[in-house]
From Swiss-Prot:
The active site is at 37. It is an enzyme of class 6 (ligase). Catalyzes a mechanistically unusual reaction, the ATP-dependent insertion of CO2 between the N7 and N8 nitrogen atoms of 7,8-diaminopelargonic acid (DAPA, also called 7,8-diammoniononanoate) to form a ureido ring. It catalyses: (7R,8S)-7,8-diammoniononanoate + CO2 + ATP = (4R,5S)-dethiobiotin + ADP + phosphate + 3 H(+). This is ATP-dependent dethiobiotin synthetase BioD. Pathway: Cofactor biosynthesis; biotin biosynthesis; biotin from 7,8-diaminononanoate: step 1/2. Homodimer. One of its GO terms (biological process) is biotin biosynthetic process. The lineage of its organism: Bacteria, Pseudomonadati, Verrucomicrobiota, Verrucomicrobiia, Verrucomicrobiales. It comes from the Bacteria.
Length: 213
């Protein structure tokens, strides 16, 4: 089974929420899966949630090798702490997790092009990992543009898009929420893996599992 990256159209669109649902569902299906958060800024809550969804014996440092205290993009946060995002440390941690698990779900930081260092964006790191990418779309006004831009950027990196998960970030639905999915389907060839209502605590894994094998 292949490892993969979870990225989003923006920050706060539900990357951690979807990543945790996937890890939990894979493990319930008998697959030894773990989450991985290469970089966290501000706090480590995302890593804690991934640990709750996955193997409980992993430390936060194993799940999240780079933690920066300022809640901003990794490049700025690292500069404020007079340090840098050490991608070699990240790769070693990823390799260790990958060797011990059947599937590693790599949750990105911020959006696809967020800066992580001088001349380096998250998309550069993703390209180095050479993993397929799952895109989480926060289903709200403006999502179509953000989704198509991100899908095109993933293609430009030569990476496979595993598919799309629409995450309804609010209880209330407006016209955009109702029509975003059909527009993204019309203007892209990425498969829709699922659509989550606000607060949903499970995810149908059938389509994703087919694409991971």
């Amino acid at each position: 089974m292949r490892n993969f990256i979870v990225t989003g159209t923006d920050t706060e669109v539900g990357k951690t929420y979807v990543s945790c649902l996937i890890v939990k569902s894979l493990r319930e299906a008998g697959i030894n899966a773990a989450g991985f958060k290469p970089v966290a800024c501000g706090d480590r809550q995302d890593a804690r949630l991934l640990r709750e969804a996955g193997p409980k014996d992993l430390t936060l440092d194993e799940l999240n090798p780079v933690f920066l205290r300022n809640a901003t993009c990794p490049y700025v946060a690292a500069r404020l702490e007079n340090t840098k995002v050490d991608e070699k440390v990240i790769l070693r941690a990823y390799d260790a997790l990958s060797a011990a698990h059947e599937c590693v779900v790599v949750e990105g930081v911020g959006g696809w092009e967020v800066p992580i260092g001088p001349g380096r964006n998250f998309s550069d790191m993703a390209a180095d990992f050479k993993l397929p990418v799952l895109l989480v779309i926060g289903n709200k006004l403006g999502a179509i543009n953000h989704a198509l831009l991100t899908l095109n950027a993933i293609k430009e990196r030569g990476l496979e898009c595993l598919g799309i998960v629409f995450n309804n970030v609010k209880d209330e639905w407006d016209t955009a929420c109702v029509t975003n999915r059909s527009m993204v389907e019309e203007f892209s060839d990425a498969p829709i893996l699922g659509e989550l209502i606000h607060g949903q605590d499970y995810m149908d894994m059938d389509v994703l599992l087919e694409r991971l094998h």
